[in-house]
């Protein structure tokens, strides 16, 4: 009789173990990737504080505007130029229309100043912001119209001019994305960046320029090394340069199929963009794309692509809006499909669990009856 009891007890535990295992197999899900919670935590905290960072920027803008309006008539044209340049810098990655307004103001003020350096500076800023808004032809026309006198212009003005002009051609190549014109635009962009090296003294910027040239020549390993050197020497308060370096390192790692490293840099870039109230950026879109295509994290990808679309719309970047607009319905549609599958899976799991629970109860009753009979 003792043997019968032991046999039934063992049978009971085996049935319980099998059913419990099946239950957990049906209800548990694999995490998309190991550091999901870390990424989610960093991004969630930054996004929660996004409005606060934007308000800080608006407060700075109001302060500069108030300073400009105080005794404006008594200010020299050089002073007006500097204050308007400060406003331009605040807006150039925040609002296209406002940045364009202050760029045109700078050109007007520069025309009243007897110095070629001011006009080159102003037109360089105008060309840069036109490209940010997707007006590549107008940007090239504006920058091409500048008369460059290398013997008399300050080195920093010349460096900014050639770097900005080179970036316009590189951005145009990225926008065109074809085998004919893109290679031509990249070549011109590299020639302009190479010209800037003669006027640079800052080591971080030199590494950045050399890294950009290597990247456009498809020398990924060399480019990555140069960008990392630029990042090590970068002024961490220069949020614009920091974002460029981080997002480009992410892009390079993505090309090298180093997906986890790419995500790491995209997160760093996106958090930096949020904290600096940057609306004109590629980091959030890049992060969303990586999470969607390489980590199957559709929920996060949908959230971040929505953020990217809102930022691009706020800034007024036509070509960014178009690119993100092609991704948005894909991500959101996939999210809806997955939620539908999850609901169906939950219903199926519930039915399956109920059936196994009934089987377990019947098995227990049967074992108890047999033990009593035995």
Residue map of PLM features:
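Alpha-helical transmembrane signal-anchor helices
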Residues: 13-28, 336-374
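A "functional boundary" signal
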Residues: 2-14, 19-339
């Amino acid at each position: 009789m003792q043997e019968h009891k032991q046999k039934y007890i063992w049978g009971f535990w085996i049935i319980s173990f099998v059913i419990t295992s099946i239950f957990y197999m049906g209800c548990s899900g694999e995490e998309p990737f190991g550091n999901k919670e870390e990424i989610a935590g960093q991004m969630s905290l930054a996004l929660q504080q996004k409005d606060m960072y934007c308000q800080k920027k608006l407060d700075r803008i109001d302060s500069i505007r108030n300073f400009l309006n105080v005794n404006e008539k008594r200010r020299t044209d050089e002073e007006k130029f500097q204050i308007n340049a400060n406003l331009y810098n605040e807006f150039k990655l925040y609002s296209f229309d406002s940045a364009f307004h202050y760029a045109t103001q700078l050109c007007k003020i520069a025309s009243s100043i007897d110095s070629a350096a001011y006009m080159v500076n102003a037109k360089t800023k105008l060309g840069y912001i036109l490209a940010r808004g997707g007006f590549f032809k107008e940007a090239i026309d504006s920058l091409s119209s500048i008369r460059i006198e290398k013997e008399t212009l300050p080195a920093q003005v010349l460096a900014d001019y050639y770097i900005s002009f080179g970036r316009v051609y590189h951005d145009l190549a990225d926008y065109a994305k074809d085998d004919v014109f893109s290679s031509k635009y990249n070549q011109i962009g590299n020639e302009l960046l190479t010209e800037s090296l003669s006027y640079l003294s800052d080591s971080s910027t030199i590494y950045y320029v050399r890294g950009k040239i290597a990247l456009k020549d498809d020398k990924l390993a060399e480019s990555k090394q140069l960008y990392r050197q630029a990042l090590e020497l970068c002024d961490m308060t220069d949020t614009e340069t920091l974002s460029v370096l981080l997002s480009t390192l992410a892009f390079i790692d993505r090309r090298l199929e180093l997906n986890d490293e790419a995500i790491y840099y995209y997160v760093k870039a996106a958090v930096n963009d949020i904290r600096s109230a940057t609306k004109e950026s590629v980091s959030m879109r890049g992060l969303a794309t990586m999470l969607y295509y390489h980590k199957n994290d559709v929920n996060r990808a949908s959230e971040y692509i929505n953020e990217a679309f809102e930022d691009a719309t706020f800034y007024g970047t036509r070509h960014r809006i178009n690119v993100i607009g092609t991704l948005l319905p894909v991500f959101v549609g996939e999210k809806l499909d997955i939620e539908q599958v999850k609901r169906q899976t939950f219903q199926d799991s519930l039915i399956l669990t109920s059936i196994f629970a009934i089987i377990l109860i019947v098995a227990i009753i049967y074992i108890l009856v047999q033990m009593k009979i035995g």
